[in-house]
Amino acid sequence: MKSTAESKETPSQDESTTSVPCTEAPLVEEGEEASFGAYKRIFTFAGRTELILQAVAILAACASGAGIALQNLIFGQFVTVITDFTNGISTPADFRDNAAELALYFVYLGIARLVLSYTYNTLLTYAAYRIVRNIRHAYLKAALSQEVAYYDFGSGGSIAAQATSNGKLIQAGASDKIGLLFQGLAAFVTLSLSRLWCKWKLTLICICIPVATIGTTGVVAAVEAGHETRILQIHAQANSFAEGILAGVKAVHAFGMRDSLVRKFDEYLVEAHKVGKKISPLLGLLFSAEYTIIYLGYGLAFWQGIHMFGRGEIGTAGDIFTVLLSVVIASINLTLLAPYSIEFSRAASAAAQLFRLIDRESEINPYGKEGLEPERVLGDVELENVTFSYPTRPGITVLDNFSLKVPAGKVTALVGQSGSGKSTIVGLLERWYNPTSGAIRLDGNLISELNVGWLRRNVRLVQQEPVLFQGSVFDNIRYGLVGTPWENASREEQMERVQEAAKLAYAHEFISELTDGYDTLIGERGGLLSGGQKQRVAIARSVVSQPKVLLLDEATSALDPHAETIVQKALDKAAEGRTTIVIAHKLATIRKADNIVVMSKGHIVEQGTHESLIAKDGVYAGLVKIQNLAVNASAHDNVNEEGEGEDVALLEVTETAVTRYPTSIRGRMNSIKDRDDYENHKHMDMLAALAYLVRECPELKWAYLVVLLGCLGGCAMYPGQAILMSRVVEVFTLSGDAMLDKGDFYASMLIVLAAGCLICYLAVGYATNTIAQHLSHWFRRLILHDMLRQDIQFFDREENTTGALVSRIDSYPHAILELMGYNIALVVIAVLQVVTCGILAIAFSWKLGLVVVFGGIPPLVGAGMVRIRVDSRLDRQTSKKYGTSSSIASEAVNAIRTVSSLAIEETVLRRYTEELDHAVSSSVKPMAATMICFGLTQCIEYWFQALGFWYGCRLVSLGETSMYSFFVAFLSVFFAGQASAQLFQWSTSITKGINATNYIAWLHQLQPTVRETPENHDKGPGSGAPIAMDNVRFSYPLRPDAPILKGVNLKINKGQFIAFVGSSGCGKSTMIAMLERFYDPTTGSITIDASTLTDINPISYRNIVALVQQEPTLFQGTIRDNISLGVFNPNTQPFFSDKDAVKSVSDEQIESALRAANAWDFVSSLPQGIYTPAGSGGSQLSGGQRQRIAIARALIRDPKILLLDEATSALDTESEKIVQKALEGAARDGDRLTVAVAHRLSTIKDANVICVFFGGKIAEMGTHQELIVRGGLYRRMCEAQALD
């Protein structure tokens, strides 16, 4: 695979307004910066417990750092012991005894480091978990408190992903890294103070090293933090766009939008990549400057020390050696400043982004306690001279000086064209917005003076597009009890009220038939229920609290005629004694209203009762005539004597209690179900994961080569240092000019070593960021692309909610960025240093080298690998748990209108927090286990240094090795220990990166069932007709024991217009899903033009099909963008190409499609016309407007097969009439085959064949006239909808 991120140009401003899906609101407040202040503020979210844990941890870290400094004292004694033996002061036996005693101090020091390292790492990590939990809690609370207008700007689309991914960045920068930093600083300060007391002049020279290092690090980190902030902002916009794509995945599949949408998603990533490239020279400068300064300072200290010794200012060589060794140990700890500063700046940038929303004051805060809460509600509603424009379109007046009185206890109906302001009134009554001018009163009180939560609890709403939440049916209806006296009642009492409400909404019967009844889980957004079932549950949710004011915004639009009749009666009954405002396009549902208000362009055209308006013969009467259905006996005159059409056969309905598939079929269904389960996937180990990442982008081979060469050069640092320090000891055996000359030479060698570090680390820092940014870009794009490749059943799985998927899109590529950035280079350098130091030790003293290398390094590596394995398992578990919390946040934010109308912000926040608490509490034990392994990696180095010191001195005393060889070997062991200790400090980044790689690799190889293959590549759908279904049975893959279709036989001829009608949940929309190949039949077959559908190339097939869904899906971008996505271009390029067929669609084609969908007038009236942003999910448009745009998108495709799933359900009567004529014309256009699902029977009465579904089968078939005469189910449906 090749990435073209490098070659893509950023779209111009003009292009971005027409083709780039943009977030309409700025994501960053003016002047906002990620600074040290933002980092400090992270810790203000720590409670008393967290502060105590952190204080104890920092004390332990400082003690651990002081323990590091104690090494120097032991080494000072070590030099004394060596000197005494060399000078003959002590005997070989005394020498061995003294060495053994000193070796024990190393053992004790290692034990202390084990305890202290375990303590501070465990406490800091746990405290960070809790602090991040508090920040996430505050962030979602702030998000849920924002007024709806905030989300209209598209500002909240990626809130769930930000909470998860930014939380992980904060976690990384506010946990164990703090302990390591304090440990390093404590070591440096302790060493400096101890040496300052003894040799203050030389020590003061050495202090220039940290001053220069810290100064350089601070400046570079500050600049780098600004770039990190900008990248996070761009990624937040990209996540928002991706969230919209994944939420509308069925539309993406149906229209083959994947490559076009991924290409638009990539435009954000290209911009982020450009900013990311600017970090490369900064990291090169940061790492190279750090190591160069350290070795230059080291050389200066050695040079000055030699000359001070020559002048007699320093008494013994041991004093110089001790100071130099202090510099070395302190410098090793200072080298951690650079990588940690990057972690801290990323945490600050991530926190600053979250704090911006946390600090934002909502104009309408649902958490506020202020406002009136009257004890009694009558229900008098009055709108007085209300004028309103949406904040996103202030130039368009939606309501113009509008006045209306809604008497208490009466039913008032609002009708009119889409966009006339009907739903706007609902939004104002719910206080989603405040009017521009005028007043709205409830029982004489201005609603702006009422408590927001109290108002929404007493004014209940059923929306046009009902939104349900993950959980059970009971959970969803119970949300309506929040804030009422029954909220804390027993489950039995709540269940009683829930069932009463369900019966009222005609939902009890179908709920009782579900697998687990009221405890049945319904999936994300209620996806496992049909549209009509969802709407009935939503009605039950709104009436369960017995509100005094009820708002019904197309509350029965998704119900079948029979259910609609019964539910309407129930609503009529529910309306008794309460104020009800009904918005309806189905006029049959409002004919009994006390007052019907006909609206147009924000004004009232006429109002009155059904009878008075009919008598007036005005606008309303004309609408009634359009919707009227003929059900009289004269229809019999047009019926064939046989009672059947030429291709129509009446099927006998036979009910079967449970469908039992053969064992082989059930086995296949279960294998398909398990195939999408990531937990069953075999995971790659670290080396395999790294190899996969390297192979994935071969275009980075030169960058990898630079990193390899840089690492090879960098690994020479410790061996070179060991040799030079050993030579330093020899220098002190000389005197006079010879000593000074040798001293000057070795000081210059240290400068050469510094120059080598400058070159190597500059290359490593620059190249690793280049690789990391490229891989992050590539995998963000690839993971979205691979998700969109999957079958619909992949998105049906509980773990694959939209929020969880977006979280993975954001967090997994970032984990790879951390793994393949400087972290992996430091790990490689540390590994090479351990190897080279080990080889050096063996080369100079093979006995000592073999004993120490094979006695110390294997247990250290073993402990580190065990930590990585445990850490990896912990990361997978926490990611899964945070995925659940992310799903809760995502569905709440995306359904903010439903959440606010139910006033369940606190309930949602409590659910979210409970998931966070569960994630934190379940992480304690595995975290404690992994920290034991970390403690071992920090202490084992002391134990094999003790072994090396004891055994080396023994060899020296026995004359088996020279003093110089011993020094080289021992210092090599010492530096190998230092390198190995650093090796596993990055294990958290390693494990996260490995887990991310495993998921991405699994997803990439996961092949959908419905896909193009070499076998079907050339197999097209032919003419697209006839379509034949032979004994089709179907169960959803995740519910194999709940059959939906139970043996459907049907033939649809070329040019026919066929309609599916029936009760909600009877299988109509499932038939549409089968014809779109969202799913394949469990048994039976579907043939297209005599070819089995499963044998046809799905891309070729879908290219001749267009779908209009019941709940239209629009994407971020302009109206033009959304319609253009419907165009099929046979030359569409793969997603990594620069070419985009969508941009080639002409404005004339767009206009033609809009006119056909009766949408041109309203679109052309907008200030930006077809270039008007649709908003996230089409939020800038009304429901009817969204549906017309979706119809235009389907018609511009010029399909051979047109699938209409309640295509006109959200349209007003006039628009429906015009659009219906357009759709009928489209259906009659040539040989086009049209399949329509409809509850509004007036839209399908002219169909060639009407199929009445019942119980998963076709109960009746025929024309409108034939079925009316037959007097069966269809006739009863028509009678229910007749208006005359």
Curated annotation (Swiss-Prot):
InterPro entries tied to this protein: AAA+_ATPase, ABC1_TM_dom, ABC1_TM_sf, ABC_transporter-like_ATP-bd, ABC_transporter-like_CS, P-loop_NTPase, Type_1_exporter
Source superkingdom: Eukaryota
Domain ABC transmembrane type-1: 55-346, 705-992
Recorded GO CC terms: mitochondrial inner membrane; plasma membrane
Location within or outside the cell: Cell membrane
Gene3D superfamilies, A to Z: ABC transporter type 1, transmembrane domain (1.20.1560.10), P-loop containing nucleotide triphosphate hydrolases (3.40.50.300)
Signal peptide: none
A Pfam entry, by short name: ABC_membrane
Protein's GO biological process: oligopeptide export from mitochondrion
Membrane topology: Multi-pass membrane protein
Induction: Expression is strongly increased in the presence of cycloheximide, imazalil, itraconazole, hygromycin, and 4-nitroquinoline oxide (4-NQO).
SMART domains, alphabetized: AAA (SM00382)
Region Disordered, residue ranges: 1-24
MF terms (GO), sorted A to Z: ABC-type oligopeptide transporter activity; ATP binding; ATP hydrolysis activity
Basic and acidic residues bias spans: 1-11
Domain ABC transporter: 381-626, 1027-1280
Entry keyword Cell membrane: yes
UniProt: ATP binding residues: 416-423, 1062-1069
Glycosylation site positions: 385, 401, 488, 632, 800, 995, 1122
Keywords, sorted A to Z: ATP-binding, Cell membrane, Glycoprotein, Membrane, Nucleotide-binding, Repeat, Transmembrane, Transmembrane helix, Transport
Protein function: Pleiotropic ABC efflux transporter involved in the protection of the cells against a wide range of toxic compounds.
PANTHER family: ATP-DEPENDENT PERMEASE MDL1, MITOCHONDRIAL, ATP-DEPENDENT TRANSLOCASE ABCB1-LIKE
Family per similarity comment: Belongs to the ABC transporter superfamily. ABCB family. Multidrug resistance exporter (TC 3.A.1.201) subfamily.
Descriptive protein name: ABC multidrug transporter atrC
Organism from which the protein derives: Emericella nidulans (Aspergillus nidulans)
